[in-house]
Amino acid sequence: MTLLASISSIGNVKSISKSNNFSSLSNSSLQSSNSIQCGGCGGSPLIGTVGNLVGGVLVGTGIIVGTVVGTVNGVVGGLLSGPNCGCH
């Protein structure tokens, strides 16, 4: 096998791996959003920014998951605001 062929095969493995990671992310996000009620407290602007960034990344890769932004907002809100806020 030539060096060029081995490099191209490594590139193929990486692209397959990335595809699997995104599909598992969307599946776990959908499952967690169906079973966990999340709500942030305090209204920190950082929470909305993180949610919007994650939503933009998912839409940019072709995976559209509408519930991910709300779930991320709740989780991050719980982490930033204290033990009484977040997912229940």
From Swiss-Prot:
Organism per entry: Dictyostelium discoideum (Social amoeba)
Family as reported in the entry's similarity comment: Belongs to the hssA/B family.
InterPro entries: HssA/B-related (IPR008455)
Protein name: HssA/B-like protein 12
UniProt-listed GO biological process terms: sorocarp development
